[in-house]
Amino acid sequence: MKLDYKSFELENELSTIDEMLVNCSANTDFQPLVPYNLRDGVMLSNKAAVVCLKLIYNHPNLSSETVKAYRIIDKVIYDAFRDNNNCTDVLHIGDYYVGIFYAPQTIDIDSVLDTMGILNAAVDILDIKFKNTMPISLSCVMAADFGEIMHSMDLAPYEGWQGAPINNAIALCNEVYSKCNDYYGATLITESIKINLKEEFASFFHAEWSSTDCPIKSYIEYVMNKVMHNWIKQNKA
């Protein structure tokens, strides 16, 4: 499978969120994936960046309104990943979204950071929209790593992704999340991401994260898309 590319347009997303808040039923479906031939059982070795986003929910109960919120979150998060043409797949398990990015060149790593900025802002926008209509608050933490990764199709029709970058990104997200709300909205990148970023982006990550769970060097900052951040500042109560 490969993500069907779609440009992330803020005004379109805002309109879609508003429409789904009014009209979306709990069983509304969408399909962001299209069949794609990955050619063989091993792919993207040493050529993949991985982004893990862990959503943080606060809602009183699992009502029909909560289910509606989940559907809207799914739509917007997938749209943010789809904005990057290098995004090969997204794994959604529980509160985790894990994006796999084909990134053989430095400029592709830069685009992964752009996607993280969109994702972070998208979650804040959803939080604002939900607070106006339902008792749900939303935040996230994110982490990214780069390195050897393997896509396995040997057990077709079952597929899977394996590799240290996936484990590292998830572990870093969990560690930051365990610090309660001190770091909500934080973006972590590993050393292997930082050294492949252009200087303008790399210099932004100067605060090193002291990890106790993940034995790799990483850095923490708060990354957000500028246009979307301006909307958030204007609309946040």
Where are these regions (language model features)?
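Intrinsically disordered, glycine/charged-rich C-terminal tails and inter-domain linkers
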Residues: 1-40, 181-237
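Short low-complexity stretches enriched in small and charged residues
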Residues: 2-13, 55-58, 99-104, 140-146, ...
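A generic short-segment signal for beta-strand/edge and adjacent turn/coil regions
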Residues: 14-24, 65-70, 109-115, 155-159
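Short secondary-structure boundary segments
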Residues: 19-20, 26-27, 82-87, 141
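A short linear-motif detector with a strong N-terminal bias
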Residues: 28-32, 68-71, 76-79, 119-124, ...
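Catalytic NTP-binding/metal-coordinating core of nucleotidyl cyclase/transferase enzymes
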Residues: 32-114
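Catalytic beta-strand-to-alpha-helix segment of the class III nucleotidyl cyclase homology domain
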Residues: 105-225
